[in-house]
Structure formats: C-alpha cells, structure tokens
C-alpha cells in the first residue's frame, strides 16, 4: 500500500490559502514603486517584517519553505528533484575552483547532502568515488576537460547534463506520479532551452547532442538535428511533440519562451490541488512557492529598473492557485 500523508496534506491545504494568485500578482505589478512593492510583500507576511531589501525578504521566504518540509518530517528522497540542481551547482563551482582558482561562484550551497564545502574538498583532493554516484563520472570528465582544453562551457555542459540525468532518475525512483512528471518536464524543458541557445549560437550537432539529456517525451537526436538545421526546423520539430505550445512561444519572443517553460512545469503540478493522501500536494506546494518567489523577484527587478507594468506583465509566471 502506498504511503499516505493525510496530516501533511491537511497542513498544506491551509497554507495554500496564503499562496499568491494571479490576481495578487497583478496587484503587486500595479503598485507604483519598488518601495511600495516591498511594503506590499511585508503586509502579506513576507520576510520577518524587518527587512527592506528584496534579496533578504526572498531568501527568508526560501528558508521558510525548507523549514516547513523539515517540520512535516518528510523523507528527503521526495525532494531530490528539487535539491539536485544545488548539488550540481556546487560540483561545477568545485571543479572550476580546483583548476583555475577563485571563480565567479561566490556561493556554495551548504544545505545539501553532501554540503558544498564537502564537495569542494572531495574534488580538490580528487576523491571522486566519495561523491554521490551520479556525480563521479561527470566530476572526472569535467576536471579532465577543463584541465586539457580550458573550455569552461564544455565543463558546464558535462555537469549540467549529469544533473538532468540525476533529476530524471530521481523522479522515477521517488514512486510518485507528480515527482516523476515534474522531473520529466524539468529535463525536457531544459533540453529545449539548450537546443534554443545552441541554435542561436551556431553550435555543431555533436556539441548539441552531447549537451542534451535523455527523456521520454523528446527524441533528443531529432531535437539536436533540428536545432542545428535552424530556428524554423526547431519550431517544426517541437510542434510535433507535447511541447508544441513552446514552439508558439519561441516564435513570439525569448521572454515569452522563458515564461512558457516555467508555466509548463506549474501546469504539470496543478492536478495535485485535488489530491488528499499522497506526497503530491506537498511537493506541488514547494514547487509553487519556489515559482512564487521567482515571480516576485522578476516583478521587483522590473520595478527597480523602471520597466513598464506591461513589460513586467509579459515576464511574470502563472500561479498555482
């Protein structure tokens, strides 16, 4: 019998009432200034009420998410798909620092297992076998690649692909349909983003194939060939897949495409609003909160940089509730 999470879901249902709706986001966009936006967030209970800095408020909201997960006493395996990108960020930083010294990675995430400082130590000492299994091969390849070619971009794609492969594997292993679907969407959307960037920068088909991670909803061989062939061919291939809406967004603008990518993932988790017993609603809530924070960051950045409301509106993400 599948594990049930009746108490945890009941708690999440009460917290969902505090999530920003599309209407709340519109109200935030409508405030006049950046300072007004900060006050709006504080009135909604964001931060501790003491911060006047956007980064401090958003960091505090992120901390609240993981404090809640800890409070609900849920196994970490259910959130691997969300924590893996932080782990591989740490690996990327550690590899570059081990070869070229201080790099533009001012932050190692320490709230991961293993921690950022531990990954840094293992890579520095070339103790790759002590890294998590999915990292070992990527760490070796990335170090060797950077050492012999000095190509930081090649180092990045080796680690980014390994991260996506780990996300796909974790999604299947978690035993939850929402986590599996989220992982699949995450990998596919990342592959599409990679293909789009590669097409725009004229990368070779071999480079594109090396950068893409296998997933069930895309044929990455066809995706790579389409990206190499050109923008029209790439949109044509996507129009044949479950990501056909992405082809339309891609034709509109880069910001429309980025927005579509995030909205696609939110739509994947929306059915969890009607689940009552599985881990799904808890995971969906965490994803929804992360999306909410990202959207607020976009709005605050727009206010700070004097963008029009319409320009900000084009960039905001769809909300979960």
Language-model regions, residue ranges each:
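N-terminal domain-start signal
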Residues: 1-321
């Amino acid at each position: 019998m599948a594990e049930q999470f009746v108490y945890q879901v009941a708690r999440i249902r009460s917290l969902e009432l505090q999530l920003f709706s599309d209407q709340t986001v519109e109200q935030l966009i409508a405030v006049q200034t950046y300072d007004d936006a900060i006050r709006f967030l504080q009135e909604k209970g964001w931060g501790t009420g003491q911060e006047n800095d956007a980064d401090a408020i958003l960091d505090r909201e992120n901390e609240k998410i993981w404090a809640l997960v800890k409070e609900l006493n849920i196994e970490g395996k259910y959130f691997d798909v969300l924590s893996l990108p932080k782990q591989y960020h740490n690996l990327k930083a550690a590899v570059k620092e081990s070869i070229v010294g201080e790099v533009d990675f001012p932050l190692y995430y320490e709230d991961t297992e293993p921690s950022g400082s531990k990954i840094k130590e293992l890579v520095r000492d070339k103790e790759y076998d002590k890294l998590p299994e999915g990292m070992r091969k990527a760490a070796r390849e990335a170090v060797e690649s950077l050492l012999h070619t000095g190509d930081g971009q090649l180092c990045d794609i080796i680690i980014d692909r390994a991260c996506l492969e780990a996300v796909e594997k974790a999604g299947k292993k978690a035993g939850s349909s929402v986590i599996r679907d989220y992982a699949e969407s995450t990998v596919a959307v990342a592959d599409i983003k990679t293909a789009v960037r590669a097409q725009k920068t004229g990368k070779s088909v071999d480079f594109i194939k090396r950068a893409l991670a296998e997933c069930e909803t895309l044929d990455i061989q066809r995706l790579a060939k389409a990206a190499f062939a050109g923008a029209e061919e790439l949109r044509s291939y996507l129009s044949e897949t479950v990501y056909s809406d992405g082809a339309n967004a891609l034709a509109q603008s880069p910001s429309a495409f980025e927005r579509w990518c995030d909205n696609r993932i939110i739509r994947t988790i929306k059915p969890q609003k009607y689940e009552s017993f599985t881990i799904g609603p808890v995971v969906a809530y965490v994803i929804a909160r992360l999306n909410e924070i990202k959207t607020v960051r976009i709005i605050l950045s727009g206010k700070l940089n004097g963008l029009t409301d319409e320009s900000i509106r084009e960039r905001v993400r769809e909300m979960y509730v």
